[in-house]
């Protein structure tokens, strides 16, 4: 017997394995039935593969947005002082989502104001590639996210101060949409399926 919960959306291989197995007299169970009708398990498997499915179908990374908002609709104080909106369990969930992601993106403004690490600390798992998306901001080389792991900076500046600290990719346009699509195509070329975005006020 063979159990598989999720079909590969790639048309080059889709359904071929099942047919080969059944032709060989092997009993095959698929989808929810393969999970013994455990809907929670099936849902977890579907979530695990959703980014891959999207990537195969659209040739773009699957974007997952994380945003902490207060009850009255704010994400930060007016003076940009950092304030905790979420509690420890929410932080663990956020870091678990990070660990599922191939890359995590913030704007250059968020990188400058919050100086985040963008790594995985509260749960076990791999830290994603760090992405900074901005236009003309100059980024200091001593920001936390340059201290370890791979970082890619999409910018209209050469960011020469970051030589040896990050990969710099020059944006081709003054138009946000054009630059955003350029970045997504670039990341798709790197094989990044799941992109987690932690936006600030503007991005």
Predicted regions and their residues:
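Zinc-dependent deaminase
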Residues: 1-203
């Amino acid at each position: 017997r063979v159990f598989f919960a999720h079909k590969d959306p790639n048309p080059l291989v889709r359904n071929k394995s099942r047919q080969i197995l059944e032709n060989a007299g092997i009993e095959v169970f698929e989808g929810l039935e393969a999970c013994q009708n455990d809907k929670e398990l099936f849902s977890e498997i579907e979530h695990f593969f959703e980014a891959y499915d999207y990537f195969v179908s659209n040739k773009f990374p699957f974007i997952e947005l994380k945003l902490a908002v207060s009850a009255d609709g704010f994400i930060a104080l007016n003076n940009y002082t950092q304030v905790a909106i979420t509690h420890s369990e929410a932080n663990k969930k956020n870091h678990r989502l990070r660990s599922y992601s191939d890359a995590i993106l913030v704007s250059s403004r968020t990188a400058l104001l919050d100086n985040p690490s963008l790594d995985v600390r509260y749960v076990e798992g791999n830290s994603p590639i760090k992405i900074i998306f901005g236009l003309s901001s100059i980024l200091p080389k001593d920001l936390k996210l340059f201290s370890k792991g791979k970082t890619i900076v999409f910018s209209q500046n050469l960011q020469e101060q970051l030589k040896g600290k990050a990969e710099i990719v020059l944006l081709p346009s003054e138009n946000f949409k054009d630059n955003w699509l350029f970045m997504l195509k670039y990341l798709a070329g790197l094989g990044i399926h799941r992109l987690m975005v932690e936006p600030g006020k503007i991005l």
